Amino acid sequence: NGIEVVVPVKISKTLNGVQITLKADVLDKLVSSGVKRFIIDADRMADFGFTLDTLKKLNQQTSGNIVLKVKKITVTSVKAKAAIKKPPVYDISLWEVKNVKKTKLTNQKENWTSTERKAKKVKKTKLTNLWGKTISIAIPYTPKKNEQPGNLYAVFVNGKGKPQWITRSSYDADQKAVTFEFTKSGVYGVGYKAKKPVLTDINNH
C-alpha cells in the first residue's frame, strides 16, 4: 500500500553508461509526500528501487543532489571472469553533488563568457555506504538453455578483483532479472554456479 513513483529513463543502445540526478528538492518532496517506493527504471541496464526508509536516510545525511552513476565495464581479474562469465557487468555508484560557493570573477580578463561569469565550485562526494539502508536492484538477464534460474546470483567484485556471491540475491522470473540489495558503491554482475555458492554479506567487507 501507499504511493509508488516510477521514473523511466530511456537509454540509447550506443551508450555504455548513464548518470541520473535526483535533485535535493525532489528528494525532500518524495519524503514529505510519504512515497513508499521510488523506482528508477534505467531501461535495458537495471531497475533501482528506493524504500521510504532509504529516501529518509539519504535526505537526513545529504544536502546536495544525489547522482546515480551506472557504467558498463569489463572485469579483468581471473577470479571475477570465472564468476561472471556473461555480461553485463556494471560499476554502480551513488554521489552527492552540491555547489559549495559561487566564484566571483574579477575583471582581470576581458570578454568573460556567460559560463565563466556563473562559475561555481562543485563538490562531489562518493557515498561509500547507505548508513545501514539498501537499494533494491534488478539486472535484466536471460538464462541460457543450460542454466537453471535457481543457480543465478548477483556477484560483487571488490577493489582487488575478488568476486563475492551476494546474500539474498536470486533470479526473479516475473522481472526476468537477477535481484539483490545494494549497500555500497562498486562493481556488480550476474554469476552462475551449478552448486550453491558460499554467499557473502558484503556489508562486512
Task: Spell out what each predicted region is.
Residues K10-L15, K23, S33, A83:
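Solvent-exposed, low-complexity segments and loops of surface/extracellular structural proteins
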Residues G2-E4, G17, V35-R37, N65, ...:
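A generic structural signal for beta-strand entry/edge sites
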Residues V100-H205:
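Proteolytic cleavage junctions
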Residues N1, V18-L30:
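Short, T/G/N/S-enriched strand-turn elements that build extracellular solenoid repeat scaffolds
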Residues N1-I11:
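Low-complexity, acidic Ser/Thr/Pro-rich repeat tracts that form intrinsically disordered stalk/linker regions
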Residues I20-L22, L55-T62, V157-P163:
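Short, solvent-exposed secondary-structure boundary motifs
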Residues K23-D25, G49-T51, D172:
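Helix N-terminus capping/helix-initiation residues
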